[in-house]
C-alpha cells in the first residue's frame, strides 16, 4: 500500500487545523500513521482511495471530516480549444488516451513534489506499475496543438527527458534508466505509442518517458496532462489529478479526444448519483440513524445528499471512482458517523470454532510447496473467458462451467476462475523480464458449477523446463500428502500431446500436469518453456482420503 509523505506546514495550512487535531482524526479516514516527524508525517492509505495519495486530497477529506467545509465540492472543466487525434495504428498497442489542460498554477517546490508523488503512487496502484495506466505532465507553453497519438517503429527518435541527444525508441528501451525499468511493458511489440504535436515534435513516449522539451519547471504556470492505458483507469487518474490541481487554484480546461469511431471530451468531472435506502444503511451498520443523521455523515465525507422519503439521493464526486455500490456509500456513512460512536455488542450466543479441514490442507500444501523451493503468489479470483479458456486452448466441459459476473465493470473481470493455471501463466508473462528460473505456486479457490473447489497449482519456467521435472514435483507433493496415485494419459489441450498426464486417485482424475503447449505460451507472450501442474485438493475430501 502506498505511503504518502505529508508536510506539516502545508497540511495545516490547507486543512485549517493544528497537527494535534489532524493526528487524532486522520486514522479515522482509513489509514495507518507510519511515522511522525517534526516537519512531516508518513501515512499509509489503502489502495481503494487513490484520491488520498496527495496532500490536496487528504486536506479536502479532512476539511469535511472535521466539519470545516462539508458537502460536495464542485469541479468543472471549461471547454478548451485543445484536440488529440487517435490514429488507427496505436489502437492495438495502447488504445486509450485522455488529457486535460490546467492553467494558472504556481509550480512551487511543494506543488511539484506533490504532483510527482501522486503520479508515482497512481502508477503503482491503479496503473499496475504503468502497465494499465501511465501519466505524463508537460509544460503547456512547449506543446503545440493539435496533437496526434500514433504508433511508430523502433527507429523513431527524439530527445527524452534528462538527455541532451536524440535517441531511437530501441536505444531508449536499452539505455535510458526509465526505458530499462519499464521496457517489459512493451516487450514483444513491433510498434510503440507516441504523442506528437502539430510541429511533429514528440511530447511523450508512453508509458516510458516524456520528451525533454516539455519539462516542467518552477517557471511553468500552465500544464498539459496526458494519461494513456487500456480501460477506465485512465479516466479515474485524470479526474483525481484535475481535482487535485483545481484545489491548488488551477483552471481546468477540457481536451477533445478524437478516435476513429467516436469523440470524447476529457476529463469528465460530472457528479454521479446513487440511490441509498435508509433501512439498508441501518440494517448493515446495526444502527438506528435518521435520514438527517445519515445526510450529516455523508456531507462530512464530501458527498451531497438529498432526502427523498426513505431514500437518499447521493451525489458522488468525480475523484471517488472507488464508489461502485450502495454499500460503498454506507461504509462512508459509518466513517462519517464515527466508528468510535458505534458501541460494540457481545453476541447473544457463544460458540466455539475450529479450523475448517480445507484450511488445514491449504496450510499443509503451502508448507510442502515452499519446502520444494516454490514462491507463493495470490492472483485474482475474477478473470475473463479469454484468459481462462481461449488462451489455454480449452473448450467444452468442464472448462465452460463458469459463473459469469452480472454487469461487469471491465472486460477483464467477467467470470469467476475455474482453474488456477491461467492466472499463474498470466503472472509469469508479467514477470518474464526477471531472472530465470521462476517457480511459483498458488493454493486457492476456483468455482465450478457454482461450487467452490480448493486447488493447488504450480508453474516452472526456464530454458529447459520439461515433463520429467514437473512430474518429480508432483510425486513429492503426493508423497507428502500421503496419497497413493497413478498416471494416465490426458487430453487437456493446454499441454503438449505426449507430454501431459492426469493425476488419478482411486480411479478418479484429480489433477493434470505436463509441458504447456507452445500456442498457450504464445497467447501469454511467454518466450521460455513452462511445465505445470494443477490438483483439485477438495476431491480428496469428497473421497475421504484426507479426512
Curated annotation (Swiss-Prot):
<comment type="similarity">
    <text>Belongs to the phenylalanyl-tRNA synthetase beta subunit family. Type 2 subfamily.</text>
</comment>
<feature type="binding site">
    <location>
        <position position="328"/>
    </location>
    <ligand>
        <name>Mg(2+)</name>
    </ligand>
</feature>
<keyword id="KW-0648">Protein biosynthesis</keyword>
<dbReference type="GO" id="GO:0006432">
    <property type="term" value="P:phenylalanyl-tRNA aminoacylation"/>
</dbReference>
<dbReference type="GO" id="GO:0004826">
    <property type="term" value="F:phenylalanine-tRNA ligase activity"/>
</dbReference>
<dbReference type="InterPro" id="IPR045060">
    <property type="entry name" value="Phe-tRNA-ligase_IIc_bsu"/>
</dbReference>
<keyword id="KW-0067">ATP-binding</keyword>
<dbReference type="InterPro" id="IPR045864">
    <property type="entry name" value="aa-tRNA-synth_II/BPL/LPL"/>
</dbReference>
<keyword id="KW-0436">Ligase</keyword>
<dbReference type="Pfam" id="PF03484">
    <property type="entry name" value="B5"/>
</dbReference>
<comment type="subunit">
    <text>Tetramer of two alpha and two beta subunits.</text>
</comment>
<keyword id="KW-0479">Metal-binding</keyword>
<dbReference type="Pfam" id="PF03483">
    <property type="entry name" value="B3_4"/>
</dbReference>
<feature type="binding site">
    <location>
        <position position="331"/>
    </location>
    <ligand>
        <name>Mg(2+)</name>
    </ligand>
</feature>
<dbReference type="InterPro" id="IPR020825">
    <property type="entry name" value="Phe-tRNA_synthase-like_B3/B4"/>
</dbReference>
<dbReference type="GO" id="GO:0000287">
    <property type="term" value="F:magnesium ion binding"/>
</dbReference>
<keyword id="KW-0963">Cytoplasm</keyword>
<dbReference type="Pfam" id="PF17759">
    <property type="entry name" value="tRNA_synthFbeta"/>
</dbReference>
<dbReference type="InterPro" id="IPR004531">
    <property type="entry name" value="Phe-tRNA-synth_IIc_bsu_arc_euk"/>
</dbReference>
<keyword id="KW-0547">Nucleotide-binding</keyword>
<dbReference type="InterPro" id="IPR005147">
    <property type="entry name" value="tRNA_synthase_B5-dom"/>
</dbReference>
<dbReference type="InterPro" id="IPR009061">
    <property type="entry name" value="DNA-bd_dom_put_sf"/>
</dbReference>
<dbReference type="GO" id="GO:0005524">
    <property type="term" value="F:ATP binding"/>
</dbReference>
<keyword id="KW-0030">Aminoacyl-tRNA synthetase</keyword>
<protein>
    <recommendedName>
        <fullName>Phenylalanine--tRNA ligase beta subunit</fullName>
        <ecNumber>6.1.1.20</ecNumber>
    </recommendedName>
</protein>
<dbReference type="InterPro" id="IPR022918">
    <property type="entry name" value="Phe_tRNA_ligase_beta2_arc"/>
</dbReference>
<dbReference type="InterPro" id="IPR005146">
    <property type="entry name" value="B3/B4_tRNA-bd"/>
</dbReference>
<feature type="binding site">
    <location>
        <position position="332"/>
    </location>
    <ligand>
        <name>Mg(2+)</name>
    </ligand>
</feature>
<feature type="binding site">
    <location>
        <position position="322"/>
    </location>
    <ligand>
        <name>Mg(2+)</name>
    </ligand>
</feature>
<feature type="domain" description="B5">
    <location>
        <begin position="269"/>
        <end position="344"/>
    </location>
</feature>
<keyword id="KW-0460">Magnesium</keyword>
<dbReference type="GO" id="GO:0009328">
    <property type="term" value="C:phenylalanine-tRNA ligase complex"/>
</dbReference>
<dbReference type="InterPro" id="IPR041616">
    <property type="entry name" value="PheRS_beta_core"/>
</dbReference>
<dbReference type="GO" id="GO:0003723">
    <property type="term" value="F:RNA binding"/>
</dbReference>
